[in-house]
C-alpha cells in the first residue's frame, strides 16, 4: 500500500511542506524510520531525531520551527499525536480489507443472520439465531454462542469466546483469549460447609466503540446484564464480575479487578492492579492510581485516589511523607525515652 503525502495531508486536514508527490508505504518510530516510511513528532524530547531521521515524511505541529536543516518532508497539523492515530487507523483498515469471506472449516448455526463484507476465519463457530452486522471480522477459532448480537464494523480476534445471549455494539474490538459472558462467581454457603452454585442466567451488553484487551474476562449477570457502556477501553488481563456497570469513556489498565454489582462512573481512569470491592459506586471522573484498593463508595466526582485502602491524593502524600520518616522518628522516640528514664533516675536519687 502506498500513499502520497498530499493524500495523507488531505486525510488529516494538514499541509505538506516538501514534496507532496512523494510516496510512503510504511509507518515507523521517528528514530527507526527508513526511506518510504512516515513518522510523527509530538513530544519535544524527541526533536533531535527529526534532524537525522531517514523517514520520507514526519507529521509535526503547525507551529513547529526546525532549529537545523531537514532532509525529510513535513506534514503540518494541529495535533500530531491524534493525526498519527488517524494514519494508523487508516493503515489497519486497509490491511483488514483483504480479509473477506468464509474460510473452511467453520460453522454457522441455524437462522444466523450475517451482514455483508464479513470475514469468518477457519474453525470459527457461530451459534443459532445470531445477528451479525456488516463489515464484521471473526478470526479463526472464535466461539460465538447462540442468540448473540454483534454490531457493524466489529472485530473478534482469534480464540475469543462469547457466551450465548450477549450483545455487542458497533465498532467493538475484542482481542484474543477474551471470555465474554462466563458465569459470575456466585455460590451459596450451605449448613454443611459446602457451596451451592447459583445459576447465572443474565448476559453481557457491550456498547459502541469499546476496546477489550487480550485475556480479559467479563462475567454475565446473575440476572439482568453486566453492562460496558460506549467508549470504554479495557486493557489485558482484567476481571469484571457479574452485574458490574462501567460508564462511558472509562479506561481500565491491566490486571485490575472489579467485584460484582459495582457501578463505575463515566470518564474514570483505573490504573493497573487496582482492586475494587463489590456493591459500591464510583463517581464520574475518578482517577484511581496503580495497586490501589477501593473498599467504599466514592460519591464525589473528580477525586484522585491512591493506596490501599485508597485515600485522596493529598492525604496519601502527607501520610507517605510521615511514613518515610518513621525510622528517624522511632530513633528520636527511643532517645527521648532514654533521656526521660535518666531524668527519672536523677529525681529518685
UniProtKB/Swiss-Prot annotation:
Known catalytic reactions: a UDP-3-O-[(3R)-3-hydroxyacyl]-alpha-D-glucosamine + a (3R)-hydroxyacyl-[ACP] = a UDP-2-N,3-O-bis[(3R)-3-hydroxyacyl]-alpha-D-glucosamine + holo-[ACP] + H(+)
The keyword Nucleus belongs to this UniProt entry's keyword annotation: no
Molecular function, one GO term: N-acyltransferase activity
Domain of life: Bacteria
EC number(s) recorded for this UniProt protein: 2.3.1.191
Gene Ontology cellular component annotations, sorted alphabetically: membrane
Family matches, as PROSITE patterns: HEXAPEP_TRANSFERASES (PS00101)
Record carries keyword Transferase: yes
Function: Catalyzes the N-acylation of UDP-3-O-acylglucosamine using 3-hydroxyacyl-ACP as the acyl donor. Is involved in the biosynthesis of lipid A, a phosphorylated glycolipid that anchors the lipopolysaccharide to the outer membrane of the cell.
Subunit structure: Homotrimer.
The family this protein is said to belong to: Belongs to the transferase hexapeptide repeat family. LpxD subfamily.
The protein's name in its UniProt record: UDP-3-O-acylglucosamine N-acyltransferase
Amino acid at each position: 500500500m502506498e500513499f502520497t503525502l498530499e493524500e495523507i495531508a488531505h486525510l488529516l486536514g494538514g499541509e505538506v511542506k516538501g514534496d507532496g508527490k512523494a510516496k510512503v508505504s510504511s509507518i515507523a518510530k521517528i528514530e527507526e524510520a527508513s526511506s518510504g516510511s512516515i513518522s510523527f513528532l509530538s513530544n519535544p524530547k524527541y526533536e533531535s531525531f527529526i534532524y537525522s531521521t531517514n523517514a520520507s515524511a514526519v507529521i509535526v505541529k503547525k507551529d513547529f520551527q526546525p532549529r537545523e536543516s531537514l532532509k525529510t518532508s513535513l506534514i503540518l497539523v494541529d495535533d500530531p499525536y491524534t493525526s498519527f492515530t488517524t494514519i494508523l487507523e487508516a493503515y489497519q483498515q486497509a490491511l483488514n480489507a483483504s480479509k473477506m469471506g468464509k474460510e473452511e472449516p467453520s460453522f454457522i448455526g441455524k437462522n444466523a443472520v450475517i451482514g455483508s463484507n464479513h470475514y469468518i476465519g477457519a474453525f470459527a463457530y457461530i451459534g443459532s439465531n445470531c445477528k451479525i452486522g456488516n463489515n464484521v471480522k471473526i478470526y479463526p477459532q472464535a466461539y460465538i454462542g447462540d442468540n448473540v448480537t454483534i454490531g457493524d464494523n466489529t472485530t473478534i480476534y482469534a480464540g475469543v469466546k462469547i457466551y450465548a445471549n450477549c450483545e455487542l455494539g458497533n465498532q467493538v474490538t475484542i482481542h484474543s483469549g477474551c471470555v465474554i459472558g462466563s458465569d459470575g462467581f456466585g455460590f451459596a454457603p450451605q449448613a454443611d460447609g459446602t457451596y451451592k452454585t447459583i445459576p447465572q442466567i443474565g448476559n453481557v451488553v457491550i456498547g459502541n466503540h469499546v476496546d477489550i484487551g487480550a485475556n480479559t474476562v467479563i462475567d454475565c449477570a446473575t440476572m439482568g446484564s453486566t453492562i460496558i457502556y460506549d467508549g470504554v477501553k479495557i486493557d489485558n488481563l482484567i476481571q469484571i464480575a457479574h452485574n458490574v456497570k462501567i460508564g462511558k469513556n472509562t479506561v481500565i489498565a491491566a490486571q485490575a479487578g472489579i467485584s460484582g454489582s459495582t457501578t463505575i462512573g463515566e470518564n474514570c481512569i483505573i490504573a493497573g492492579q487496582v482492586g475494587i470491592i463489590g456493591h459500591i459506586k464510583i463517581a464520574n471522573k475518578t482517577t484511581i492510581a496503580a495497586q490501589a484498593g477501593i473498599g467504599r463508595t466514592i460519591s464525589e466526582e473528580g477525586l484522585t485516589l491512591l493506596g490501599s485502602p485508597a485515600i485522596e491524593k493529598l492525604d496519601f502524600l502527607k501520610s507517605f511523607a510521615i511514613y518515610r520518616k518513621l525510622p528517624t522518628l522511632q530513633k528520636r522516640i527511643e532517645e527521648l525515652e532514654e533521656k526521660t528514664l535518666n531524668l527519672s533516675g536523677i529525681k529518685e536519687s
